[in-house]
Amino acid sequence: MDIIIPKQNPFFDKFYRFPHFPNSYYYGIIFSENNYFQRGATIMKILFYDTKSYDKEFFEKLLPSYPGIEVKFIEANIHEETAALAHGYDAICAFVNADLGTPVIEELHRQGVKLILMRCAGYNNVDLETTAKRGIQVARVPGYSPEAVAEHAMALALTANRHTHKAYIKCRENNFALNGLMGVNFYQKTAGIIGTGKIGQAMAKICRGFGMKVIAYDLFPNKNLDFLEYVSLDELLSTSDLISLHCPMTPETEHLINSETIAKMKDGVILVNTSRGGLIKTDDLIAGIRDHKFFAVGLDVYEEESAYVYEDMSSSILPTSTIQRLLSFPNVTMTSHQGFFTVEALTNIAETTLENAKAFMVGAEMKNLVH
């Protein structure tokens, strides 16, 4: 049997004990970057945590194209009590709300996990220092559908502004009065985009389509963007009618929206966040809402969301939380971290995640490696 050994194959110990052949499970494997399986052999096992029906649907469509990969889907999310379920798996796959702190990483290391596949763009919930220390690699799915998130940001802005969600309910109850449905024009108003990565750029283009003037703030301005004007953060806050957050969660951006920055905003501003909940200091936002600073607020992400997001809590009594306080305000519109949730995005997530796994498996270059 010919054996083509790929460079830096992370599964060397497992796959080159051929003289023993205690099990025909690996018999006939030929290794190369383009031909990494033969005779239906399983090369890599992945445990998917926090799996929803839509996750399975999109991954199972693509799995036949990756016959060297075996996966198991479980509903439980990963945390200290469930990390040990990864015993016997080469990799785990997790989502944005997973607990991947130091204790969990240490347990994954004890169970022999070599790779963490994040089926999302963000990884601020992963303890990268510990994964590096334990030799566990982390891959993600960058930019799987910037347009999906940007479109949802504008949908939130429009819904919060024009009260379409309330109008729908009123009409279903045969109430066609217009009381409480007054909005404002976006045309010829100023949109302030904080963060001009792919999503921020997509949002800027959408705002331009509404006839808005688009200004932006970013720590690293992109001089090639001719459809917006970069300004200082203070100028953006003080002149924008619509502010949309599209920056990553970093120590520099945590609680970027706080009492000080809110005070600099125009009265009657509309604020939208589809990026990370920690960008906004929620207590300060609530104080601003009570002071009538905001015409409307649209939130797809929020602090404390990890305990509730993606779960059906409709039959539960939630403990006192900032989420409940936000929901009590008539000018706040909230959705359940669904900005990414389109057919195109889920297809891209599944494909990129499996490609990340394949690249790791055969020792190819990993384009989406965090470290």
Regions found by a protein language model. Give the residues of each.
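Short glycine-/small-residue-rich Rossmann-like dinucleotide-binding loops
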Residues: 96-97, 241, 247-249, 275-276, ...
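Rossmann-like dinucleotide-binding domain for NAD(H)/NADP(H)
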Residues: 268, 277-371
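Phosphate-binding beta-alpha-beta segment of Rossmann-like dinucleotide-binding domains, i.e.
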Residues: 134-190, 194, 202-205
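An N-terminal-biased, well-structured beta-alpha scaffold segment characteristic
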Residues: 44-138, 258
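Structural alpha-helical scaffold elements that stabilize or flank donor/cofactor-binding regions
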Residues: 84-85, 235-236, 261, 325-326
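Short, Lys/Arg-enriched N-terminal segments with co-localized hydrophobic residues
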Residues: 25-43
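Rossmann-like dinucleotide/phosphate-binding beta-alpha-beta segment
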Residues: 179-267
